[in-house]
Amino acid sequence: MSNTTTFTLTVLPTTLPVFLSASDTSLGLHHNRVPLGYVCSSATTITVRSTAAISLRFLNNNRNQERSVTVEANSSSSFTHNETYVPFADRVVGGDARGYVVECTVNNYLSVLPHYTRGLTDEAAFKNELRALDDNQSFAFLELKNALLLVPPPDKAELLALDLGALDNFYTTIVDTFDHLIGLVNVASDDPATRNFNKKYFCKADSNGVGAAYYDRNWTAQTNVSMSRYLQPRATNWLVLHEIGHAYDFQFVSNAPALNEVWNNVLADRYQYDFMSFDERQRDASVYENGNRDRVERNIAERIDNRAPYESWSFFQKMAVFTWMMDTDCGRETMARINRQFRQIKTFDSSPRYMPTFDWWVLLSDGDFVPYLKLMQVEFTSCRVLSNNNVVDTFLHTNSLVRSKRVYYPVKELIANFDALTNNYGFVAQSNYSLVAPGEVDARASLVIHCDIDDARQIAGQIFYVYDGTRLVWQSQIDDSNRLVVNDIHAGVYTMVAPRGRDKRYRVYFDEPASIAGLNEHLYLFADTSKPTKRLIYERLDSSPAGDRVAAHVLGINDLYRAKVIFDFKAKRMSVHSFASSFNSGYANMRYFVINVKRDQLYTFNHTFTGTQNFVGVMSVDIAPGDTMSSFHQQGDTRFIFLNAKSLNFTLNVSENWYSNTNLPSKNQVLETRMDECVAYLYANASRLIPFENHLKDELYLTIQSLPDKDYYMRLYNPFLPAHFKFNTFDPTTGSNSIIMAVVIFCFVLVALVIVFILVFVNQRGRQNPNAAEQAPLQHS
């Protein structure tokens, strides 16, 4: 029997949002298409004429039996295909808003394609039409609000038994949840980077697909002759949640550490969080391996104990790290801010650069997750790549201090006998690793802090402060034994603001826990129930950190951050911090970045990073005067940055306390640049940093002392210096001043601040600092 039909079809375009390009594959940009309305066979001939160049696809449930053809504008073409198939016309991405018109003749088709459109088609009538078809040609098409499903014959019975309204709701809630998590809105918005578009996800079967299922440019598919998993509207349907989540893998996801197969799972996990009860989540959530939360936690605890880099963890272990952050009050908003800022950068920056995700996360979040992420063996780059590939400091640790963030930490790490299952503290938690801020659990701790300092007079009589966010929790001075006794505060992690010396400068840090031991930029006080004794170390500083150590930065594919090389001339050590296993996949197993150190013509260190499958972690080697460091980077003219100089090759001759290379900045130039960075950051955050002693003031003072014209800079930057070195400052342990003198000093400082800002930012003695404006902390949108 010969069936022939001729019809005209208007195909409207897919809107191209400003934050995507036509070549992108995200958000199902190329998934939207229109069926021609018939099931066809090898005997079918399709003749098409279109007002625009279009793609026709002849689809079924096997990629090896499908075909894609192009129809040129205003020309007539005829096609056949030697399989059973359903023809579709792609919507043009970013095409004319009026769409294009297709004149089509289908000769000798098998049957009319049963087509269900939500809100328009009667479900019973649709199913009757499908039921009447022969099983071997019973393809069906579902046009839902956010999904298009080409259902193959093997799923006929399941489709007939399915509530299509429930299926539509399933896909709608998935897309709405994921869109909300990344900050896309469906209402009119003045910000084009937040506006949604008419996207739909095309779902099908593909018996020759990859893995169990996949997401790609043109559709998402189950690797089977059946697509039954895509027809099961339930919160435990991880396959569908996971694959649609891949639509939200934007360019920054592959930054260090690579979060491919993780970022999409974070979205999928939030769907389960929203649509499961507490008991269901304990039993069925994928993040807890379907009822094995204890095992998940034990395995992660083992990773922590072994100090295994986060990059080496399994996909689901990596996801769990995000799960516990997302469970907090500020988790979702942080994810939305990252995605909004990504879209703004991609939209308005002609040479976009994206931060490593965890650096981005802690800078944009309203909560402080630094101690938690350090516990989870995450290493921060603490720097930002600019559009010209110069690299600047983000002051990552200081950012949390500036913004007075509350600190979140796993409850089990604070309260040793806490058990989420028995709820023994009356605090409902999804996991023993659920994150809490101080006071959220009714458990208290008392601490004795021993201050280990070479000269107790440097801190005697001065106040130590402990904060929970902006709230002052405790304050006191050291006793005669150089101790601080903190009684009965809530278990949690706090910020301590400590005196840092009078005429001496110190690195100040706690020696525990190991994950943050030695952190000088932000003092985290751990009030836990099992370790009542703490040790606060005062390590004497007599030189500027900027003059003691310098860093080089290794970028890889798409200018993503890959490694940092640190030369510590004071400690006589070079360390290489590798943040990602894949540097540039285009180079595969060929050499990409090489660095070595020679002493007396013999290698003391020699390592080659290839394009892929590299070591992740830290490698170190001792260096000594007379050593030579050499490096090679395949793309080093833009992607190996040493003090913002770029080259394929660098050679450094190590001297007693610096290096010899006339193509690189001198030590004084490095110190002056760092001085400008410190002043710019202190100025931008004066209200929070000026009133308190902090590491940045110390660094500024020590940097100035290392410069030949230090007296000038001591006067110029006096308001930003540690208290002991400010003009006419009064040390209460040495005598008393009159009220009049105090008022005079206060007025002088105010006037000095105004004068300094004029001098620094208008003149700066003729020196330029093109990066200063970009070194203030990132602000959330």
What is each stretch, according to the model?
Residues 77-79, 481-488, 614-620:
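Short, surface-exposed beta-strand/beta-hairpin micro-motifs centered on an aromatic residue
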Residues 33-41, 51-203:
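Zn2+-dependent metallopeptidase catalytic core
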Residues 128-327, 335-349, 357:
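Catalytic cores of extracellular degradative/oxidative enzymes
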Residues 749-765:
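Single-pass type I membrane-protein transmembrane alpha-helix
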Residues 1-4, 352-566, 573-577, 657-658, ...:
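Beta/coil-rich, acidic/histidine-enriched accessory regions frequently appended to metallopeptidases
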Residues 52-64, 340, 457-472, 578-606:
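Extended low-complexity, serine/threonine- and proline-enriched intrinsically disordered segments
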Residues 765-781:
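Intrinsically disordered cytoplasmic terminal tails of membrane proteins
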Residues 729-747:
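Extracellular juxtamembrane-to-transmembrane boundary of type I single-pass membrane glycoproteins
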